[in-house]
């Protein structure tokens, strides 16, 4: 081979290598250009097969990032470094879309670039240089079509977290960016592709813990996440919970359960639950009305069924939860809660964020299991709103209360009482307060079994504001109506209620300053709740009363409260009622139950002649001449007998000793003369009856003090009351006061006519229908007054008392107890020989005063009885018939007793704990409103 051929071959090889190097450089440049263009322009890369699938399903898969769908704003912010092309690829009909550019407000310009593989051409060029070198270059040219389109969008305000303030604009108007082939309608024509509307029903940041709701239950709502799922914007919702309307709007930060409610500048989240308090209610409906003050509602099965009516029909707006639940409430009868009041610009609740705005087109309330689940959510705002909403649901709805218990909601609420945030434990306590009120006693037991009482006490000791303290004490008041919880409250809550509420806010001071005026009573509603709770537990048993009496400062503060209220001319308040009823219960059996009670006991007076009006024979034995001569004389001619001074004390009385001191007696007298409330009158008369019971030193002093204060006429006036309980209490007090001889004379002169008027029969009181216990109490009082009191017996005959007594015996429609009590009075009257001739002249026969108790009616008594002329003893026995009223009837302990040491005492206690609603016409009661005090009295 000659040199020219070698040189030509070398030249060709060099040319080829140079061309290869240039081609490689060009290829790298093209790839770099492609990579750069792809990184800048590519948004969506859809293959024809995927595109056909998307068009067939009518949905579009959006990029998923960090557990949520990425919207336009997210794609603008995302990094492009993760988009790489790893070498040459088969770009089969790729579609590229540029990032939209906002040309002007409301418009976005998008550029679409499309490659046409069919139109790709290869261009080959051959170049020969002067030295004979041939250079061949092959270049592939692709056909690229660039299209620019403009679309109009509605700006969506963004929040600080990058998500829209109102998600409805995104969920309803979001247009996924696609290639132009896919941005056509079904007929091939141009048209935007609209993504599926969101289907979330609760806030986008509402996530449950991995274990469902943080706990599992053996029964009730399931704890698995499949049942309720995540409550974020991309939550997985079961079909039965999915909204039925296509125009359903995704919740926004303005919705009811938004995680971070907006509060004015300088405000705090605590302001969300600030309400202007009204008088405390048995149940509170702590909610605010949103959406133009229309109330919310749910179907009876907590369903979310689509309501009928046009979208403009206001009836489609959800009404209050209690509306037509279980068909328990008639249609169109709603129980409105007072609207929350704004305080210093704060928001009463999250509902008010949307006040004045139209409701969402397809909003649904969360179901009861969902609300209970929200109590375990990690955000405090969700917990507090769920608790407040649960309190609203339970208002006047026993079915919901029972369902909350069955769904294990009560343990969660009790656990929230220890939560550090006020809005959380306040809402939980409010829900427990409503749950604890009602006919279902199992709710109270459930709270007790969850250690609810100790939890309430812990919260009470930490509470420093009136609103929270009021709810806590109201809940304890509700719980105290159940017998099995009373001692638990005494053991755990007594000292906390006394030290944290009664003493600090009563105005009483442990070291009083004589020069200082009485302090004003603070937090009256809280004191009312606390006194009502202690009033209930004081009827439990002697052990409870002993602990209450010995609680340091309790009796002192109670007496101070009543004195202060009387001084303010407010003797008819509920606070006075609860305090006086509590003092009455603490005075029950006080002569027996106080420490060292034996030092106050007095011996029974000796009776010189046991044969008298109370002899075993109806007509008695012959009396001595001295006895008959002394019968008509006044036994208290000596003026010294009309005045009895209380023992002198070296130190002021404190604690339980105040229960039988002159100052407390004057309180009862003032209430008898000034108060118009039947319950207060009854309690005052009952307290006097208790203090005058038994043979003890202070009982004798108090009987005399009441006569000196001219209280006998005030008590006798109560016999004309229209309220049976007041009449019965006054009758019992007069009976005990009649033990004093001087009192007996005055009562016989002034009270016998009123006592006779209250007996059944005759025309004067034909409309009255007193119970058996009241009639027996009146008869026993009459017998006590006329015994050894001839003038009183004559007064009885003059007021047609004989006719009524005989009618009770012979009518055949009275109970055995009434017949026996009337027979005792008739026997006492016939025992006076001075009255026999006048009675015979009036047509009465001896047989009218002889009563065969064997023939008495036994319809209301099946037990054996004592066939004697002595009063029947029905010691500590309650009436079989419960009066149709809210208050607990005063028991008839000792209404017919043999010994003065055991009778004449009364204890005010609740007999039927199932009655929780007050009825009109009851003593001092009213229909419980959303702000009315709890009417649970003992």
Swiss-Prot record:
Biased composition (Basic and acidic residues): 875-888, 909-922
GO cellular component, as recorded: adherens junction; apicolateral plasma membrane; bicellular tight junction; cell-cell junction; cytoplasm; flotillin complex; lamellipodium; membrane
PROSITE patterns in UniProt: ARM_REPEAT (PS50176)
Coiled-coil region list: 10-46
Sites of N-acetylmethionine modification: 1
Complex formation: Belongs to a multiprotein cell-cell adhesion complex that also contains E-cadherin/CDH1, alpha-catenin/CTNNA1, beta-catenin/CTNNB1, and gamma-catenin/JUP. Binds to the C-terminal fragment of PSEN1 and mutually competes for CDH1. Interacts with ZBTB33. Interacts with GLIS2. Interacts with FER. Interacts with NANOS1 (via N-terminal region). Interacts (via N-terminus) with GNA12; the interaction regulates CDH1-mediated cell-cell adhesion. Interacts with GNA13.
Functional summary from the UniProt entry: Key regulator of cell-cell adhesion that associates with and regulates the cell adhesion properties of both C-, E- and N-cadherins, being critical for their surface stability. Promotes localization and retention of DSG3 at cell-cell junctions, via its interaction with DSG3. Beside cell-cell adhesion, regulates gene transcription through several transcription factors including ZBTB33/Kaiso2 and GLIS2, and the activity of Rho family GTPases and downstream cytoskeletal dynamics.
UniProt name for this protein: Catenin delta-1
Species per Swiss-Prot/TrEMBL record: Mus musculus
Primary gene name: Ctnnd1
